[in-house]
Amino acid sequence: TLYVLNKIQEVLRELNVSVERYDLYEFKSNIVTLPQTLKDTDGIILATTVEWYGIGGYMQQFLDSCWLYGDKEKIANIYMCPVVMATTYGEHDAVKTLTEAWEILGGRPITGICGYIAEVSELEQDAGYDRVIEKRTEDMYRSINQKVPLFPNSNQAVKQKITFTQSLNLTPQEAE
């Protein structure tokens, strides 16, 4: 996943896009505050490596924090591109999980990148993969830059009908 992210970042810089990168492991003690960094964001890339099953604990914590503490009005205007690479199995399930979570948060998921790669050297040695990453990154850029509308989805309809989280306006520390 890091190889793919580095390539994406390279392409975005060529397009003069400001990129801020957060490694959830490095911010593990402050994950609950990260949703506040989304306030001036047009797009977000949620990237994870599936080494066994699922999206990983830190990513789940981040999404939970977006649900509990994130500004839903702001998230509603943020495009999300999932990037998932698997070393065993489950990349499609992880993309689905990230996409559905972002939809439930009210955000705008767009097509991302997912694949199975046993060894990073497979990515590095095949220029075709670089072209795929570049193309998907350019598509992501266009979607965000042109503010491409998305079709409504049932996750939003269900959320509007059956869920209502009362905002208690608690800080992360108070919520604990």
How should each PLM-predicted stretch be described?
Residues 76-129:
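Short, glycine-/small-residue-rich phosphate/pyrophosphate-handling segment
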